[in-house]
A protein has these predicted regions:
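Zinc-dependent metallopeptidase catalytic helix centered on the HExxH motif
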Residues: 1-32
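Short, surface-exposed loop or secondary-structure junction motifs
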Residues: 32-42
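Active-site-adjacent bridging/hinge elements
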Residues: 40-53
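Catalytic-site signature segments of enzymes, centered on catalytic residues
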Residues: 50-66
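Glycine/proline-rich low-complexity spacer/linker segments in large multi-domain proteins
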Residues: 194-202
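Beta-strand-rich binding/interaction modules
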Residues: 121-122, 135, 142-193
Length: 202
């Protein structure tokens, strides 16, 4: 990576690789335990990318480059799907354009994944890397067994798993939100693919 400001690329992805190794050894449950531990370890004190020309000490004082860096890759994997995520991650790790002979920035990683996904991922990268925010979901009952789900601080269309009385389904939640039918309040992202808070409004 180019300088200390982008150390999450090395440290975060390396930490995520540990979760993948646990999956190979112990299956999905082992992977989930590691990812949950990484999520619990996030401090949310400073953005992972805090500016150019950071010192080594300043960078490594931000432990989120490990934990949040790993969870960011977990979220990105869900957002893109394995069929896009893993070939792109392999390219990042093996293509000479991104290896140690070159200076790689967060922007380079963003553009690589955006190209593979054929979509602009800048809002997603900015949210995870350059803020300490979590995705703010609200759920409001708007009629008999009718619920409105909105995202209040992130406006890129986002695939989200939602559990209702009919089962679990992946839906795209855009800036207008979505309305769903359920006999009980829906569960948003029950498997924890995103850093989030969920509020059930009165």
């Amino acid at each position: 990576n180019k300088d200390w400001a982008h150390m999450w690329i090395q440290e975060g992805i390396g930490t995520y690789a540990e979760a993948l190794a646990h999956y190979e050894l112990g299956g999905q449950a082992a992977y989930d335990r590691i990812i949950s531990a990484h999520r619990r370890g996030i401090k949310y004190k400073k953005p992972m990318v805090g500016g150019e020309e950071l010192s080594e000490d300043e960078t490594y004082a931000m432990t989120d480059i490990y934990t949040k860096g790993s969870f960011f890759m977990h979220s990105l994997r869900f957002l893109l799907g394995d069929e896009i995520f893993f070939p792109t991650l392999k390219k990042l790790a093996t293509d000479s354009a991104y290896t140690y002979d070159n200076f790689v920035t967060s922007k380079d990683v963003e553009q690589l994944f955006s190209k593979s996904a054929n979509k602009d991922l800048k809002p997603f990268f900015d949210f995870y890397l350059r803020t300490t925010d979590v995705i703010d979901f609200t759920i409001k009952e708007v009629g008999y067994q009718q619920y409105q789900i909105r995202i209040n601080n992130f406006f890129m269309p986002l695939p989200v798993e939602i559990s209702t009385s009919k089962g679990k389904e992946k839906m795209i939640v855009g800036k207008e939100g979505i309305r769903i039918q359920s006999s009980f309040p829906p569960l948003v992202d029950p498997n924890g693919y995103y850093l989030k808070k969920v509020t059930l409004l009165p």
